[in-house]
Amino acid sequence: MADQKFAPTQDGPPSDVERIKEESNYLRGTLAESLNEPLSAGIPDDDNRLMKFHGSYLQDDRDLREERRRQKLEPAYQFMVRVRLPGGVATPKQWLAMDDLAHRYGNGTLRLTTRQTFQMHGILKWNMKKNIQGINAALMDTIAACGDVNRNVMSTPNPYQSEVHGEVYDWAKKLSEALLPKTRAYHEIWLDEEKVAGTPQQDEVEPMYGPLYLPRKFKIGVAVPPANDVDIFSQDIGFIAILEEGKLTGFNVACGGGMGMTHGDTKTYPQLGRIIGFCEPQQIMDVAEKLITIQRDYGNRSVRKYARFKYTIDRRGLDWLKNELHARLGWELGEARPFQFDHNGDRYGWTKGVKGRWHLTLFIQNGRIQDTDDYQLMTGLREIAKIHTGEFRLTGNQNVIISNITAAKKKAIQAIVETYRLTDGQHVSALRRNSMACVAFPTCGLAMAESERYLPSLIDKLEFILDEAGIREEDIVIRMAGCPNGCSRAALAEIGFIGKAPGKYNLYLGGGFAGERLSKMYKENIGEAEILETLEPILFAYAKEREEGEHFGDFVIRKGYVKAVESGTDFHQ
């Protein structure tokens, strides 16, 4: 493959972010002072870069940006806080704590993310410390939920295979704990831990990460086939559980996935993780740590858009990666084992698991937990949390599973579901049940177009077409992203939209239904009228001409609307 297709390994001197990390004294910077500075609701850019490692981003309300500029006021600064919640598992007490904190310090809503955790928006600087202390008091934290480190570790919340799921979740939790930064900066700044006198050697402070941490974010997921609801091929490292006779024997190891790109730069692209071998369960920690150190040592620290692990691998090759990994491990991965994914969506409604426990998967449109005039979703879930004795399991599709419900509690929980009309999605189209959107406007500073606030109304219009075509109950994965950074993993959708400008999107078709294939751009920079005009004949053709069991993404490739994308390096071809 031609060299010019690949991002360079390094591109000159280290970026400014590398300087900020190096000078930060292990993520302290001047954050403590900036948070106490009373003249601005914001913080300096250097500290904002460090704030990500603590689980937060400085944002502003973009709906108010122009008006405040006219009034010569600073932007309406506020913070987003993201919780570290390995595998998306929260207790009822933790759910109630997040609900309370969202009303006390946030905008009164919670956002379930595509990485199985909570986000809170609208927190003012003066409330940040109290808010993070409240999260920690509920036995959660926000460490490494953002930043150039390993982020929230995902895990399949599969109610059908609860015993194996429990084992896999334990590994996800162990990975999350083991790969945390070791600096005490978080505890000093937010939890008032006293700083220990003396300066330890850098390898004592961060034995794995070092003082510069990683070149960019790093994401790990663990999946249990046949469910790929964590989109395992989108992860920097994906561990695919291999079951033999119902027992966990180990994990296939996939490397180098990632969804982000930059419009107009063909050296950036979404990429799928590639399987490099198999490890036994007790080897998973060693494999993850050694892969992270490879990215630490070889990732691009000059240009951040070229810094993800996928580019490190694509530049040097899979054989190089395997050789480097085996050298660091001192042993070799085994041959990959066979497995099969059949979907990357959630399975809604009631299911019965082991030990007589029940699980209820509810549809949460775009992950937004809030009360509106006609749908008291937040209140309903709060009432469930008050009586529930199991867990809340957040899914990678922004939904929630009320899990491990005892037979004695099932009737009471179903009564709350009926009282508040909480939905398992059966009364909405299959397209909507398989939809996902990132936050975008008004809080995300990177958004180029609407996403969460727009996709539901676009689906309203697409549902008219689906009804006419007779395919309302046909599962089709549709996702929207407000920018090309890929938080909603739109490049894996059968129908994907990636924002380019207000009201304008690139339309992508042909992603794999089980998250195993990237999509391909079909039309560029189009608005709603052209979106509907474009999709209508394709959806009608699918209704009439599809083969039995054929998914929409496979159909558009077979009929020649787009070519199959075998690798991210061909995404722009």
UniProtKB/Swiss-Prot annotation:
Species annotation: Shouchella clausii (strain KSM-K16) (Alkalihalobacillus clausii)
The protein's required cofactors: siroheme; [4Fe-4S] cluster
Gene that produces this protein: cysI
Enzyme Commission numbers on file: 1.8.1.2
Database matches in HAMAP family: CysI (MF_01540)
A GO CC annotation given for this chain: sulfite reductase complex (NADPH)
Family: Belongs to the nitrite and sulfite reductase 4Fe-4S domain family.
Residues where [4Fe-4S] cluster binds: C438, C444, C483, C487
Listed InterPro entries: CysI, NiRdtase/SiRdtase_haem-b_fer, Nit/Sulf_reduc_fer-like_dom_sf, NO2/SO3_Rdtase_4Fe4S_dom, NO2/SO3_Rdtase_4Fe4S_prot, NO2/SO3_Rdtase_4Fe4S_sf, NO2/SO3_Rdtase_FeS/sirohaem_BS
Residue positions binding siroheme: C487
Gene3D superfamilies: Sulfite Reductase Hemoprotein, domain 1
Annotated GO MF terms: 4 iron, 4 sulfur cluster binding; heme binding; metal ion binding; NADP binding; sulfite reductase (ferredoxin) activity; sulfite reductase (NADPH) activity
Known pathway: Sulfur metabolism; hydrogen sulfide biosynthesis; hydrogen sulfide from sulfite (NADPH route): step 1/1
Protein name: Sulfite reductase [NADPH] hemoprotein beta-component
Cofactor note: Binds 1 siroheme per subunit. Binds 1 [4Fe-4S] cluster per subunit.
Biological process, per Gene Ontology: cysteine biosynthetic process; hydrogen sulfide biosynthetic process; sulfate assimilation
Record field: catalytic activity: hydrogen sulfide + 3 NADP(+) + 3 H2O = sulfite + 3 NADPH + 4 H(+)
Class of the enzyme per the UniProt entry, highest EC level: oxidoreductase
Keywords on record: 4Fe-4S, Amino-acid biosynthesis, Cysteine biosynthesis, Heme, Iron, Iron-sulfur, Metal-binding, NADP, Oxidoreductase
Role noted for this protein: Component of the sulfite reductase complex that catalyzes the 6-electron reduction of sulfite to sulfide. This is one of several activities required for the biosynthesis of L-cysteine from sulfate.
NCBIfam families: CysI (TIGR02041), PRK13504.1 (NF010029)
Oligomer status and interactors: Alpha(8)-beta(8). The alpha component is a flavoprotein, the beta component is a hemoprotein.
